[in-house]
């Protein structure tokens, strides 16, 4: 169980110019440490997002050393508001949202397709990031209905059934993998549990649903460390599965260490250190997918290596901040772990630099939902490491996403995952990515 150090907690919420002033005026620390050792968030007032895990489960970096946090604008805030209103109106009567089938990518009306767990979970995480809880927020009702939809999907699924939905060939499944429903649903439950839930019975249902998802995810791992039935770009599903298990483990849930170890090795194998390039065999030949997955999967260990070296330097154990296996061993890390951390750090640094290139960000050549997912993975990994790379990435994303938002507030894809619900939820997560950072700076 990994604890959060000092004022550092996990990310998840929203961003905009001016929100830092709101947090400056707030004197309440919205975090509490429970008997199980997990750091959770006390439900904040509406529009005061809590520090939580992000969609991809990255730890909060030390932003005070690198940035003022003000990269957003009134244009972004207006865009987020329009997007959130569109998402609210797109919710189905069953509490869910749907992406539709791969065979009917032309259907863009959200009420003309059945709700699916993957899309619903993605929207739920966007609601959480944008300042909503089960108790408070402009879209709290929508979030409660989201949670109920997903809990029922898991509870009604037999233990011996691999998937939590009978729907097949949905856009997320075909492009991101057959297991994507349970993977994103697990991530949603983990994020939700970061808040204190006063209803003991409800909390137990969420925990049981999460544990059931974890079991199904672990059973779906392939022998190479990736995940079975990976869809068009298997590396993306595997990266998301890795994230879901990592964050669940951080929440104190039981996760098989061997499964995680195999998963990280699989992701690292998608970047060739010797040639400093991505291996695209399992990313549909698209470098963006491979790089974003590798960058994300190596981010946690890369950050750990950096923290160990910086701490050893500050206490006098090391005279320089250079991340090598030798220095990690001097800092007290075992030889085996030191080599693993050094490798992860090198891969993360190299893949992040590659991921900022315009030819990589172009992805398939036009934007589909999988491009948006890849952008999000790349950006959050950059945020975790600190520095200015994430600002460069955010500027590119802001310039791109604001231009292509539809007049009704939605976004949609132009190939593969065309669903406006799926794409809008992901774009909301991207544009609101740094609100956690601004709040975390105030807590230092």
Question: PLM features: residue spans?
Answer:
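Preference for long, amphipathic alpha-helical scaffolds in soluble/luminal domains
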Residues: 2-4, 21-444
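Bacterial N-terminal signal peptides that target proteins for export
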Residues: 4-15
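Sec-dependent N-terminal signal peptides of Gram-negative exported proteins
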Residues: 14-22
């Amino acid at each position: 169980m990994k604890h959060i150090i000092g004022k550092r907690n996990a990310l998840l919420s929203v961003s905009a110019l001016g929100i830092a002033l709101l947090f400056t005026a707030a004197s309440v620390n919205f975090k509490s440490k429970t008997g199980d050792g997990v750091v959770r968030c006390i439900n904040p007032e509406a529009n005061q997002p809590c520090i939580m895990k992000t969609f991809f489960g990255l730890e909060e970096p030390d932003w005070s050393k690198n940035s003022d946090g003000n990269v957003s604008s009134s244009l972004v805030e207006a865009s987020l508001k329009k997007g959130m209103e569109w998402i609210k109106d797109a919710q189905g009567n069953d509490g869910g949202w749907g992406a539709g089938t791969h065979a009917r990518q032309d259907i863009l009306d959200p009420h003309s397709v059945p709700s699916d767990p993957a899309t619903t979970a993605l929207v739920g995480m966007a609601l959480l990031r944008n300042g909503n809880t089960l108790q408070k927020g402009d879209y709290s009702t929508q979030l409660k209905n989201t949670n109920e939809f997903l809990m029922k999907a898991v509870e009604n699924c037999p233990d011996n059934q691999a998937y939590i939905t009978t729907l097949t060939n949905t856009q997320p499944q075909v492009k991101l993998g057959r297991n994507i429903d349970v993977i994103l649903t697990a991530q949603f439950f983990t994020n939700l549990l970061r808040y204190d839930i006063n209803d003991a019975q409800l909390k137990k249902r969420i925990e049981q649903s999460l544990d059931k998802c974890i079991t199904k995810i672990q059973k779906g791992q392939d022998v190479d460390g990736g995940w079975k039935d990976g869809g068009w770009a298997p590396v993306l599903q595997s990266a998301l599965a890795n994230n879901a298990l990592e964050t669940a483990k951080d929440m104190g849930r039981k996760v098989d260490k061997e499964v995680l170890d195999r998963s990280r090795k699989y992701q690292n194998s998608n970047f060739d250190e010797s040639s400093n390039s991505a291996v695209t065999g399992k990313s549909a030949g698209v470098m963006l997918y491979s790089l974003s997955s590798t960058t994300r999967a190596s981010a946690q260990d890369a950050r750990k290596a950096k923290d160990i070296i910086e701490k050893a330097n500050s206490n006098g154990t090391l005279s320089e901040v250079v991340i090598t296996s030798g220095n990690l061993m001097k800092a007290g890390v075992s030889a085996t772990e030191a080599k693993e951390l050094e490798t992860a750090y090198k891969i993360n640094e190299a893949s992040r630099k590659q991921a900022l290139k315009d030819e990589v960000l172009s992805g398939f050549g036009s934007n589909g939902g999988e491009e948006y997912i890849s952008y999000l993975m790349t950006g959050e990994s950059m945020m975790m490491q600190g520095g200015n790379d994430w600002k460069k990435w955010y500027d590119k994303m802001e310039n791109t996403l604001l231009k292509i938002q539809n007049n009704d507030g939605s976004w949609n894809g132009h190939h593969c995952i065309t669903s406006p619900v799926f794409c809008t939820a992901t774009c909301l997560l991207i544009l609101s990515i740094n609100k956690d950072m601004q709040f975390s700076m105030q807590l230092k």
